[in-house]
Amino acid sequence: MKNSERFSAAKPLMEQGGKSSRKPGFMSEDRISELPEVLLLQILSSLPTKLVISTSVLSKRWLSLWKMVQRLEFESSRNIYDFAENVTRSLLSHKAPVLESLHLKVGDQFDGVYVGVWATIAFTRHVREFVLDLSSYHGPRVRFPTSLFCFDTLETLKLDYVYIYVPCPVSMKSLRTLHLLSVVYKGDESGHNLFASCPNLEHLVLRRGFFFDAVVNFIIDAPSLKTLLLSDPFSARESSRGYVIKAPSLKYLGIESVEGFEYFLIENVTELVEANIRNVSKIVNENILGSLKSAKRLSLDLSPLKITYPTEVMYHQLVYLEMHTHKVEWWNLLTHMLDSSPKLQVLKLIDRETRHENLEFDKKYKDQGKWNQPKYVPECLETFMWRNCNWGREEEKEVATYILRNARQLKKATFSTDPIEAKRLCKLAKRRKMREELDGVVMTSNSCHLVFEFE
């Protein structure tokens, strides 16, 4: 709902109750001031903090009303010194017994002491969500005070581009959500002690950045953790050896851009429901695919030449599989997954759009092996989708034909393609030929509906 709609929607409330002391025929233009304070605070909480504070000049009633707003958000302006002083003054003037959330985004170099001041004030107001975003800041990383990891009312903490040092366990018993983005850690113990201090942590987002820190072994030990998103796009650090994940309550796992470590080990995630694994390669010792055997839904963007897939692992719970088809020999990973997933119901393959030719180098320049057909297609397979299918290699045609021919319970097969430019009509002719070939495949499923569509 737009802000103007909030104000207009509130007007009838003022016309419903009580007698007015104003003379007949007098119409107040300041109807909103007559609303109950609780409703006014709800309205103010939906507005930018800068605008909320400016309402103090409206009238005597509004003078202190903004000080009770429970959600504050500040973003730095060009004059960083005025900004820092204004934020400090605003927080010191704030009177709400509980501060629901405080968001701070600073893009210019400033005195890092302010971070401690702001956070301390917020935590004494029993803040429940604290966000410090320095992602646009180009100065040296600001240290987040260790003493501030000791507030039990905090439920959500999001830090971006800071330096942390946690030499011993602290206390954040209420923390449920933790985001650590481009954070520098002083030694292995900082991360380990931080996670150990959050016994009720449920959601963790961890994105490492391009920097040097002293972490050698990154251990995530969180018994209550339910969702984990881990990204390490600059993982080729000389100091780092790898990751260990200990999260027995984990329901969702996302791993992206992890490469070149000595190890990546996941322990005992027997409650896992869904996982999304992308761009993982060149790890000496890892058990990523082997640890996902309890998952019901998987999305994989991997090359079987660069990751371990143990042949003895069975995915007995897997019903939905999504695979990207632009990595080297992706079809052999598909064979492994089909042979290992007896209850699979939905198979979705996703290729890169043909106009992104610079992303198609794997198909053109790698000496790829031939496709080894699976032993069978899962009996439960009902839906087969192939998005942006290009059929640039014979093996891809074999995959499509094999599934259509051998999926006994298949109900719908959909092949979608992206549009082709007029100057590439030869490719259009090849696509039409492939469509005719697939349309002529004799399928074992009598009820399968074959669909061809453009994106």
Curated annotation (Swiss-Prot):
Keywords: Leucine-rich repeat, Repeat. SUPFAM superfamilies: F-box domain, RNI-like. LRR repeats lie at residues 80-106, 155-182, 183-208, 227-257, 277-302, 325-351. CDD domains: F-box_AtFBL13-like (cd22160). The keyword Repeat applies. Coiled coil: none annotated. Residues 370-417 form the FBD domain. SMART domains: FBD. Residues 29-75 form the F-box domain. Gene3D superfamilies: 1.20.1280.50, Ribonuclease Inhibitor. Residues 1-26 are annotated as: Disordered. This is F-box/FBD/LRR-repeat protein At3g51530. It comes from Arabidopsis thaliana (Mouse-ear cress). The lineage of its organism: Eukaryota, Viridiplantae, Streptophyta, Embryophyta, Tracheophyta.
